[in-house]
Every structure is written in C-alpha cells, then in structure tokens.
Amino acid sequence: MERKVFSGQNLIWVMLLLVQLRGYKCCIEKERKALLELKKYMISKTADWGLDSVLPTWTNDTKSNCCRWEGLKCNQTSGRIIELSIGQTNFKESSLLNLSLLHPFEELRSLNLSGEIYNEFNGLFDDVEGYESLRRLRNLEILDLSSNSFNNSIFPFLNAATSLTTLFIQSNYIGGPLPIKELKNLTKLELLDLSRSGYNGSIPEFTHLEKLKALDLSANDFSSLVELQELKVLTNLEVLGLAWNHLDGPIPKEVFCEMKNLRQLDLRGNYFEGQLPVCLGNLNKLRVLDLSSNQLSGNLPASFNSLESLEYLSLSDNNFEGFFSLNPLANLTKLKVFRLSSTSEMLQVETESNWLPKFQLTVAALPFCSLGKIPNFLVYQTNLRLVDLSSNRLSGDIPTWLLENNPELKVLQLKNNSFTIFQIPTIVHKLQVLDFSANDITGVLPDNIGHVLPRLLHMNGSHNGFQGNLPSSMGEMNDISFLDLSYNNFSGELPRSLLTGCFSLITLQLSHNSFSGPILPIQTRLTSLIVLRMHNNLFTGEIGVGLRTLVNLSIFDASNNRLTGLISSSIPPDSSHLIMLLLSNNLLEGTLPPSLLAIHHLNFLDLSGNLLSGDLPSSVVNSMYGIKIFLHNNSFTGPLPVTLLENAYILDLRNNKLSGSIPQFVNTGKMITLLLRGNNLTGSIPRKLCDLTSIRLLDLSDNKLNGVIPPCLNHLSTELGEGIGLSGFSQEISFGDSLQMEFYRSTFLVDEFMLYYDSTYMIVEIEFAAKQRYDSFSGGTLDYMYGLDLSSNELSGVIPAELGDLSKLRALNLSRNLLSSSIPANFSKLKDIESLDLSYNMLQGNIPHQLTNLTSLAVFNVSFNNLSGIIPQGGQFNTFNDNSYLGNPLLCGTPTDRSCEGKKNTKEADNGGEEEEEDDDDEAAIDMVVLYWTTGSTYAIALIGILVLMCFDCPWRRTWLCIVDAFIASGKSMFS
C-alpha cells in the first residue's frame, strides 16, 4: 500500500515537472476568449486598408498557444497573461477604449496602448464600472498610453489604478493646466512621463507622489521658475526632465541643488541664462547633466571637479564667451560623453593644458568652439566613437592620429575648417562617417582610400579644392550609401569601379567639377541609387546605357554639361520612380516625348536652354501638388496645351515660338508661377487667369496679346498661402539618406548621432523682370517676390484701377502697349511696390500725387506718354531723374528743366484717394473738352468764311470759282 502511495506521489511530481519544463500549451480559455473579443473590438475601429495588420497571430484556433501570440507574455507557472501590448493599429478615426474588455486579465502587470503614430485612442469608458474600472486590474504596475489623442478626461480613470508604479502619458498633446491632483491615489507611482503633452500654466504640487523617482515634464509649455519650488517635496527624485519648455532666467539653485538624490537632470532647450550654479557640484550622485540649447554664459565652476559619478555632460548651443577652461573635468573618471558649443564667436576653449585626463570618452563633440588647435586631452583618448570638431578654424593636416588611436571610431566630423592636407591611416579602419567638407584641401584623394576605409557609409568631401581623377579603389566601398564630392576640381572620366562596386549607393553627388567624357557609358550595379547629381561638369555625348540600370533612380541632374542626342533615346521609357529630371543648358535636341510628362511621380522637370523643338505634348501627369516645368529658351512651336495650365505648379515657357491664344482651362488652384514671355501668343488675356488665386509671378510680356486688361486680375492672390514657398521645397515623395547611432542611453535621454540628408530638396531659381532689368530670384528673396508683367504687347483701353488692390505686388510692368486714359490714383495702395513701369503707352492726365506715399518705390518710369501737369515731389519721387519722364512734353517741374510758372498746381488737400482720383479724371476730361471745342470752332469759322465769299460778287469770289473750274477740268481729263 505504501509503495502504491509512493508511486502515486512520484507520478504527481513527474507530471508537475513535465508541466514546468514544457509549459502550458495555451493560455487560460477565459483569457483566450477575452483576447479574441479585444481583437474584434480593435477591428471594428480599424480602417479597411489596415485590417490585415490587426493582430494577425491572434487566431481562433484551439491548437494555437495564445501565450505565443504577438504582444503577449504569460506567467510561466499560472499561464495567465501578465503583459499585453496592442499598439500599431491603423484606426480609421479617434476612438474610445472599452476598459471592460481588459477585466478578464486578472494578473496583468503591464499594459501597452501606445500609439507610436498609428493609434488614435482619445478616451476611456466603462458602462458598468465607470471611473473605477482599472481598479479591477489589481496587479497592474506599468501602463503606457503614449502617442494617442487622450485628453484630461482619462485622469479619473487612472486614479483608480492604485497599483501603478510606472505611467507613460507622453505625446498626447492634452494642453491646459496639469491636473496632477486627480492622480492623488497613485501613491505607489515611481515613474511618471508627461512629456510632449502641451501642458502650460504653473507646475502643480506633487505632495501625494512622495515615492516618485523619475518625472519627465519635457516638451510642454511651462514657463514660470517660481512653481519649480513645488518639485522640492520630491525628495526621492532621481531623474528629472524639464527639457524644451519656456523656462527662463538663472538656473534656480534653491531647487535643483537641494535634490541630493538626483542622478539625471535634463534642462536642455529652455532659456536659462547666467552662469552655471556652483552648488551643482554638490550633486555627487549626478550621472547625466544636459544644459544644452540655453543661453548660459560664464565658465565651468571648479566645483564640477567633485561630480565623481558624472558620465554625460552636454553644454552645447549656449552663449559662452571668452576663455573657457576644461580643468574641472580633469578628475571625472566616469565621464563618457562631453558636448560643448556656443552661438557666440567669442568663445575660446582651452586647448593647451597640463592635466592628464582620467576619463575615456566615447563622444567628444566640440563644434563652434574657436579652438584653433585640437585640445590636448583628445590625444589621450582611445575609446572614442564620435568626434565632432566642425567649425573651429583648425588648419594643417587632417588628424589621422584620431583614427589610429581610436580603432572603434565610427563618426569623424571635421567640416567647415581650414585643413589643407588630406591624409588617411595606413591600416584598415572601421570608420563609418567622414565629413571633411568646406575646408581648403587641395591635391588628390589617396589612391588607397577604398582599401583603408572600406566600411564607410557616409563621406562628404564637398567644397574643397581636390584635383585629379577619382581613385579606382573607391569601388571597394561596398557599404557606402552617401558620397558627396561636389564643388571641387576633379577631372577625367569616372572610374568604372565606382559604377560597378559601390552597389549600396543611395546618393551620389559629383556636381561642380570638371569631369569629362560620357555619362554612365557602361552597365552599372547601382541598383539602389536614388539621387544622382552631376550638373556643372564637362560631360559630353549622349547619355549612356548605364542610366537604364538605375532602376530606382528618382532624382537625376546633369544640367550645364555638353550632352547631345535626343531626349527620347536618353531617358528610359520605364523611369517610373523618376520625380526630378534636370537636363538644362545642354545641346539636347528633338521633341519632348509625351511619355516623359506622363510619369506618375514626376514632380520637377527642367529641360531649359537646349535645342528642343516641335509641339508640346498634351499628356501631363495629374499630380496632387502640381508639376514644376521649366522649358524656357528652346524652340517649341504650336499651341499651349491646356493640360499644362491645369496641372503645373510652376510653368516656365519663356522664349520659345508658341503661337495661338492662351486657352481656357479649369483652375485647379495649383499654379503659383506662370511665365510665357517671348512667344507669339495672340488674342486677349483670358479671364480664367483671374481664377489663379495662388499665383505669385505672372509674366505674359513680349507677345502679341490684344484687347483690354481684365479688371478681375485683382483677384490674383498676393498672400503666401499655407505651405506654399518658392525658395526651396522637398517633394511629396521624399528620399533621404539617414544614419542613426546610439552612444549613450539614460531613463529619458538618448545620446545618438542622427544624420539625415533630404536628397529631394531643391533651390528654385526664377527669372523675372523688375527694376528695369532681368534678374534671377532664389532663396529667401524669391519667397517675397510678387510680380505682374504684361509689357510689350498690344493691349489697349484703360489701366484698371482694380490693379491697385494687389497690395503685396513688388513689380508691375505695363510698358510698351497701347494703353490710354490716366494713371489710377488707386495705385497708391501698392504699398510694397518697388518697380512701376508704365512707359511707351498713350496715357494722359496728371501723375497722381498720392503715389508719393509709395515708400518702397525704387523705379518709376512713365516716359513716352501724353502726361501733363506738375510732376509730384516728396518721398521716393525726389530720387527719380529726368529719364523717368522723357517724351511727355506737357510735364513740368523737377527733375525736368520745364518751368510750371502760370500752371495751376493740381495737388489739392482733400480727404481721400477716391476723391483725388475723380479730381484727376475731371481735369483730364476738361482738357479734352477744350480741345474739342477749339477744333470745332476753327472748322466752323473757316466754313463760314468760304460761304460768305461765295455769296458776294467780288474778285475773290471769281478767283475761287476759277480755281474750282480748273480742278474739275483736270479731273475730267484724268479719267477720260
């Protein structure tokens, strides 16, 4: 009997052991059903296009172990769910979360509902338990609600989760005062993250959260330093984040210096000013101190020498000036990251020192420190991962010893200095990022650069003076994704190894050099290449077959070379990824292929300055944002396709041979610049142009347009719309080269190197006539340029006074037309006008004296009209010379030499611009009436005199009749 009992006990223990070893086949059935109900609820809130991605491993299969489903973790003993994550769901709209769906998970310890961009929970509800719902989850310790659309309505629900120790609510953009008192029952809370939530006002009391060890209030709108006193009660606080708020004034030492347990203090991105508090040196437990991006000045306090635990110190982007000693860092044995820079050019960091560093840094970032020489302490570093010495006036040789002493160095940034000699180590190195752009380096690239630096991911050597050919060893850089050698003096043909070996290249920029020979003459292996910029070189011949192998090419710029051949044979027909194509100022010829403008993603096309001819294609891609088209300075003929007007954002067709009228088109609101200067367009200006409410630059000059100027042109927008700019833009399809490396991580702070280059950014340059010259506008000046040019046409009639409503207009040119009547006094509303040209017309009347109020007017030309009266004086009119008024003999006064003595001064002191305009028009009308009466009376008197002579018999009458008979006789003889 005892043996049977013993055997039975052994069997039970064996079964328990097997269960422990193998685990449960599935979670508890009750929780399985609850999970499926939760999934069903999530599906009901998800957009149709995201249904397949909703928890796909959560299946209604009894053989499936739900403890292995995504986002779950089970207790190995009980089989109950202890961790649940249901983020990454594509909701069709913001939705409430039904908390009752979570009640079956009785042992749940961690709940992650973070959106991470995708989720859009905006509230919580429970129709049965109400605000007490979360009290049912008695074991819940960690709750993550970050990156959603929650508001303050969730706080009463959270107050019931009394077991919480960690709560993340960041990135919900809640706004308003922080209702921390509504969390008074969370007495066990140790970590609270409220960052990036839009809170403002004062920082409230935290007296009921005495166990709090980590608090993050970063990226809110707190501004008062007084309320920081409320944080003093948190005596157990070890981590405090107040970065990116609006805190200003001196750093409150009575607050931070009393937090003796602080290990991490993040105050970056505020407006703190003054010197660093000496008492910060008493925080001997401090490991992380970030004071970057403030307005601090002074020097490092000597007390910092006592921060024995300090590992991370960032003082970058402040206002430090004068001599800056690094002596207080000498004994910081644990220091790993040191960052320092200044917005002031007066900072002079100590480079020569007698102390030997006791630390081994992984990050040494000292840009904008006016070093002059590399600091001595870097010589003793052997564990560096990142070194940034950019913008420091350093000269001489590139410091290759940094690579030799630090075999694990990943990032070396030396840009914007005065280095003259480029050297590399003799042994292979693991360097991944090398930036030596904007220096004074000459000579050639070392032949072995590809052998020594085979792991490079990013190399920028642009804006130097390199010469010679590119070394063939560069083809061994198999991992390189970004290579920029633009703005140098390289020459010769591109090495074949570069085109076949660097198969990881995403961006290749070789512009502004002297490279020659054909472009891409061979098949390449650059299948990952997205951006290829080769403009401003000496490339010749046709574009080679290698272009067809660039299957992912999106941006191709070969402008300003000597390329020949046909466009149709140069660009592959299957260039479906192409978004930017620039081949301007070459020798390309032939017609424009319709397939080119039909490429779906094409957003920027510049073929200007070539020998292209024929009709423009009518098939244009219907882009949501509009296509930017530059085809000026070619020989295109035929009509202007309506599809170009309907789908272009910028359309530049200047100096071609287009004919016909400007077609009627459907306004899509895309057009912002329309340049049709120098063609053979005829007909009237269509009123459809008035519907271009976003237009900024309109040039119809030097054509054969006739008719009147539509008054509705005052509907043209002269206000920069939201999101509309001309100086530069990135396409809606954006490709960039990114690189991210993490060098240090703490509770709320991550020190990482992030490199992102937006390869689609373009600086737009547009030519427009202003101030009597033809200028190119780009950059910031283009963003403020508004212009209307209708000059050199056959327009007639009056100048519409409504054009004065274009208050932001900077250039208006109506010269060389057939315009009559007077100059509208309403032009005085053109407050920003800089250039006003009305010359070579048939304008009459006076120059409105209200125009003297145009304080920005720099060029004013009304020459060769029929204007009369006294030239106004005052303001900018005192700066114009006689050339502005030539060909108007009835104008008098300064700056002409014609006296106005005896003429009535037409400047009257009246009350409004409209009344003045009526007065000017009346004066012009009176002049014409006098002219008509004078002419009529002259003819009447002459006729009466002839009749009188014919009524009396006198020698004069007989003589007159003889003359008439003679004319009649001669007429008969001529026609007989």
Curated annotation (Swiss-Prot):
The chain crosses the membrane at residues 929-949. One of its GO terms (cellular component) is plasma membrane. Disulfide bonds: none annotated. Coiled coil: none annotated. LRR repeats lie at residues 105-127, 137-160, 162-185, 186-209, 210-233, 234-258, 260-283, 284-306, 308-331, 333-358, 359-381, 382-405, 407-428, 429-452, 454-477, 478-501, 503-528, 530-549, 550-573, 575-599, 600-623, 625-645, 646-669, 671-692, 693-715, 782-805, 806-829, 831-854, 856-879. Residues 950-976 are cytoplasmic. Residues 911-922 have a biased composition (Acidic residues). PROSITE patterns: LRR. Residues 898-910 have a biased composition (Basic and acidic residues). Keywords: Cell membrane, Glycoprotein, Leucine-rich repeat, Membrane, Receptor, Repeat, Signal, Transmembrane, Transmembrane helix. It is a single-pass type I membrane protein. Residues 27-928 are extracellular. Belongs to the RLP family. This is Receptor-like protein 14. It comes from Arabidopsis thaliana.
